Amino acid sequence: MENTSVNKEPSIIVGGFVLGGAMIGAGMFSLPTIMSGAWFINSLFILFIVCFFMFHSGIYILECISKYGAGTNYFDISKELLPKWACYIANASLIFVLYILIYAYISAAGSIIYEASLLYGINFNLRAIFFIFTIALGATIWWGGACASRLTSIFLFIKIVLFILAFSGLFFKAKGDLLFSATFAGKSQLYLYPFIFIIIPYAITSFGYHGNVCSLYKLYNQNERKVVKSCIIGCLLALVIYLLWMIGTMGNLPREQFITIIQKGGNLDAFIDSLYTVLNSKYIEGFLLWFSISAVFCSFLGVAIGLFDYILASLKFKDNKTGRLKSGVLCFTPPLLLCLFFPNGFLIAIAYAGTAACVWAIICPAVMALKARQKFPNSGFKVWGGKKLIYAVIAFGVVGIICQSWRNLIYCLFIVK
């Protein structure tokens, strides 16, 4: 077990990598597919906007917990700073997002590990993969937060190396006429603008690190500046990786091919199979496969650490073997069971996670920051930007919720024939 008496603060790079691991993962595989309507330039513009607002909503959570000290979690601050009904909605949204993301990553892990087993001539049972994957990585989180954080950093480093090895060829082969195409299936750019709104729920999920803010605040011994720097590193790292990812995929796969991926359910294996068609090297195919596996591992660990700590603190379990085991059972059993019965829900889960994240990760932190400034007008850390930025963040969260409804309508009108 982790020695809790050791209070040495890790580097901000470790914190940035933990947040990057939570953001950069299996969810990024949904981006090129869901961006195939709006395409490269429009999608890049949306990513910058979403990154800006998600960064600030995350440090609003930091501002609120800094008023109450280490060991405080999202439930505690929402109970103190929100009306009772809003507190229940916020925490229900948080729990829903974290659970459904863990479900999505178990689903993605199963499909990609199954694909890898077939590549090497082994035929594993898909549901057995779900079970082994969850138990193995869940055990590292049970062992201790520092252990899981370091493992996440290792997987993220491996993922970046494999990303470079797998996609360096794709970057050089990227075609400008594909990236900057202004038409699709003979339709004008004006026809494509509604697809911009589809991107926002997925992009919100792709910059979701908020469940880890409380854990980082505890990890850095209430050092707000280190947490903010870690958030900056994590968000910028995610933004750069997503940009390179978009160039490597959209510059090589025709837009029409993404429709085929969507029709196959948008799962990770369908997207990987499409990329195989433009790769001419078995080595690069192997790098791509292992990159996908490391991406799923990173995302799972990053999100699961947040939910595990939330359950541990909210239910007042002791931070020992027994207490952490109880937290682990409650954290991993529901998404594992859901995956056993509904194994192919990756793309749908990512979208609905983004919608619920608008409530707990964007709107509620901004509202709580307003309340905290009224309650503690002269104390401690305060996010820059004043009330105008807070109101802008709230408005962005409302737009994100509306976009999920638009996504369903737009797909019915433009994708489903």
From Swiss-Prot:
It comes from Proteus vulgaris. Its main location: membrane. Involved in tryptophan transport across the cytoplasmic membrane. Plays a role in transporting tryptophan which is to be used catabolically. This is Low affinity tryptophan permease. Induction: By tryptophan. Is subject to catabolic repression. Pfam families: Trp_Tyr_perm. Belongs to the amino acid/polyamine transporter 2 family. Mtr/TnaB/TyrP permease subfamily. The gene is tnaB. InterPro entries: Amino_acid_transport_2, Trp/try_permease_CS, Trp_tyr_transpt. It is found in: Cell inner membrane. The keyword Nuclease does not apply. GO terms for biological process: amino acid transmembrane transport; L-tryptophan catabolic process. The lineage of its organism: Bacteria, Pseudomonadati, Pseudomonadota, Gammaproteobacteria, Enterobacterales. Keywords: Amino-acid transport, Cell inner membrane, Cell membrane, Membrane, Transmembrane, Transmembrane helix, Transport, Tryptophan catabolism.
